[in-house]
Amino acid sequence: MKFLIMGCGRIGATVATSLWEEGHQVTVLDVDPDNFFRLPSDMRDEQGVTLVGDGTVSEDMIRAGIHGADVFVAVDLRDSRNALAAQKAKHIFQVSRVVCRIGDPTRQKMYEELGLVAVSPTDATSQMILGAVHSS
């Protein structure tokens, strides 16, 4: 499968690396080229894996291969950027599977009503901690 990931922070880099190691075609789009150092060197060296650009800008999304993407993942630190990029991927570029990171779990239902898969690290971490507390 072909994945386009916007954001190469800790979450984006981890997701991108895992998918790449599974043999998927992965392109990571980030405004800061220094963030690509979170990726393994052999992954960074592969042609077309990293691209400096803004995932909310249509031209940069096109350069990154949005038209051929099976999945778009928005994992920027800012919810507003993730929401904008994810909506463009889903509704303008017709990407079938769009996953959007949201820091504020109260917005999750709204994003899901827009047809996006919304993932909240805050919610996920809280659930893991509660699970650990209750299993003690």
State where each predicted segment sits.
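Cytosolic regulatory regions of ion transport systems
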Residues: 1-136
